[in-house]
Amino acid sequence: MKRIGVLTSGGDSPGMNAAVRAVVRKAIYHDVEVYGIYNGYSGLISGKIEKLELGSVGDIIHRGGTKLYTARCPEFKTVEGREKGIENLKKLGIEGLVVIGGDGSYMGAKKLTEHGFPCVGVPGTIDNDIPGTDFTIGFDTALNTVIDAIDKIRDTATSHERTYVIEVMGRHAGDIALWAGLAGGAESILIPEADYDMQEIIGRLKRGHDRGKKHSIIIVAEGVGSGVEFGKRIEEETNLETRVSVLGHIQRGGSPSASDRVLASRLGAYAVELLLKGKGGRCVGIQNNKLVDHDIIEILESKHTVEPNMYQLSKELSI
């Protein structure tokens, strides 16, 4: 394999640039040319593809977002769209592709593999919801962004003796809410993977208030429901002054943490190794601090789960 491509797809995550950098440098180290596909699968179809050199990835390891940009691409879900993308790759002599993104990006890589084009997936999403890896690129940075927000909100919650509901990202996965809630000392954590009892939460808030507790923090993953609605209900049923903060897309931005930079570098380089060994249709990950790879179809058919012991711990510590 003498030429490979790399693209970022789906929602951006801090550390994607570090992964792109690792792909380019690892490939060039092995005398393999690298082409960057801009705007994800959309750029693959439109032919927005450029050769990347060492200088192309200079000064990006510490930058959030993605140098290659990203976009949603409904057209790629069609056979015609995928065939057009493969045609553009073959015109340039590109023989393999590294795809950095979440499960939607993995689905695109799977489809390309089924068309006979070798792809390797690299998990890049703040949600940490990709099976087969302990952590995804961007999760640690997003987690630290949320924890920083919790700490600051707690300062004002304490000053005004208020209850705060903080809504975080996580439409289908509660990792951000769970980890940030544990690290931030939240009184209640609501995640999509676990049922909750609203009356139990309200009772806990009332008991805390009765014993002199001046403020409370409740973390709600967006997949559970609207933080605004939770805030209204809590205030109505407890008579405690309640405010809501929806963190939104700030969770996706920012300079990647040291952990995410290292993870992205390891996974990006490993993806190139797999392609050069002729191993397409795979996706990479980290488990117990060791690099692993899995069949991409198996991963797409698997379901990510949160650590049940961590969720139980969060309940035990929030009494």
Curated annotation (Swiss-Prot):
- Residues holding ATP: G11, R72, C73, G102, D103, G104, S105
Q: Where in the cell is it found?
A: Cytoplasm
Q: Which GO terms describe its molecular function?
A: 6-phosphofructokinase activity; AMP binding; ATP binding; fructose-6-phosphate binding; identical protein binding; metal ion binding; monosaccharide binding
Its annotated function is as follows: Catalyzes the phosphorylation of D-fructose 6-phosphate to fructose 1,6-bisphosphate by ATP, the first committing step of glycolysis.
The record's keywords, sorted A to Z, are: Allosteric enzyme, ATP-binding, Cytoplasm, Glycolysis, Kinase, Magnesium, Metal-binding, Nucleotide-binding, Transferase
Asked whether the keyword Kinase is assigned, the reply is yes
* EC nos: 2.7.1.11
Superkingdom, natural source: Bacteria
Q: Where does substrate bind?
A: T125, I126, D127, R162, M169, G170, R171, E222, R243, H249, I250, Q251, R252
Q: Gene3D superfamilies attached here?
A: 3.40.50.450, Phosphofructokinase domain (3.40.50.460)
Q: What is the scientific name of the source organism?
A: Bacillus velezensis (strain DSM 23117 / BGSC 10A6 / LMG 26770 / FZB42)
Q: Which InterPro entries match?
A: ATP_PFK, ATP_PFK_prok-type, PFKA_ATP_prok, Phosphofructokinase_CS, Phosphofructokinase_dom, PKF_sf
Q: What's this protein's family per the entry?
A: Belongs to the phosphofructokinase type A (PFKA) family. ATP-dependent PFK group I subfamily. Prokaryotic clade 'B1' sub-subfamily.
Residues at which Mg(2+) binds: D103
As cofactor, the record names: Mg(2+)
- Oligomeric and partner information: Homotetramer.
> What's a GO biological-process term for it?
fructose 6-phosphate metabolic process
Positions of ADP binding: R21, A22, V23, V24, R25, R154, G185, A186, E187, R211, K213, K214, H215
Q: Does the keyword ATP-binding apply?
A: yes
**Active site (UniProt):** D127
Name used for this protein in its record: ATP-dependent 6-phosphofructokinase
| CDD domains per the UniProt record, alphabetical | Bacterial_PFK
Q: Give the reactions, separated by semicolons, that this protein catalyses.
A: beta-D-fructose 6-phosphate + ATP = beta-D-fructose 1,6-bisphosphate + ADP + H(+)
Q: Note the coiled coil stretches, chain numbering.
A: none
Pathway field: Carbohydrate degradation; glycolysis; D-glyceraldehyde 3-phosphate and glycerone phosphate from D-glucose: step 3/4
